[in-house]
Amino acid sequence: MIGLVGKKVGMTRIFTEDGVSIPVTVIEIEDNRVTQVKELDNDGYRAIQVTTGSKKASRVNKPEAGHFAKAGVEAGRILREFRLSEGEEYAVGQSISVEIFADVKKVDVTGTSKGKGFAGTVKRWNFRTQDASHGNSLSHRVPGSIGQNQTPGKVFKGKKMAGQLGNERVTVQSLDVVRVDAERNLLLVKGAVPGSTGGNLIVKPAVKA
């Protein structure tokens, strides 16, 4: 089953009939418009490309304008592709609404996490701090050794060090679908999702459901 592109609206809470409070993230999923259908014969795999939302004409470059015009679809703010399962069929120009999640129990949500700038190893990787005293006067939050000796004589790739924190693609898996509001194009999922308010999200049925 395909996924859809949505936008993070924010967080709130709803109550069950028993009075239990559930923290939910509200995701606005406007109709996704199919801009391209990829077929096994031409492309080597089956997929659809979708767009959603709208974009000022002045913000659409010429290649994008031609692509949207060929599909006969209004220019959207983002283009994303989803693989098709066996038996799934879609046509260019078709609209797909949030209702496809009506029978889905859990979803995976992908977004871009909030950027936190340059961060040290304590904040970025949860390194422990060194002694506050006992002879330590300068190295309370430093990472310590980053290597070994003449052998191997280098710092290994992937070494946890200070650097950019956040602003990367993150997927949160198996979030419960609490409510699907087709009238207002809203999907309510239990818990938090990556990114700030207004950020683009990709919502797919959970892989591990």
Swiss-Prot record:
Residue segments, region Disordered: 132-153
Gene3D superfamilies: 3.30.160.810, Translation factors
Modified residues (N5-methylglutamine): Q150
One function term, GO molecular function aspect: structural constituent of ribosome
Superkingdom to which the source organism belongs: Bacteria
SUPFAM superfamilies, A to Z: Translation proteins
PROSITE patterns: RIBOSOMAL_L3
Keywords, comma-separated and alphabetical: Methylation, Ribonucleoprotein, Ribosomal protein, RNA-binding, rRNA-binding
Family affiliation: Belongs to the universal ribosomal protein uL3 family.
HAMAP family, per the entry: Ribosomal_uL3_B
Job description of the protein: One of the primary rRNA binding proteins, it binds directly near the 3'-end of the 23S rRNA, where it nucleates assembly of the 50S subunit.
Annotated protein name in UniProt: Large ribosomal subunit protein uL3
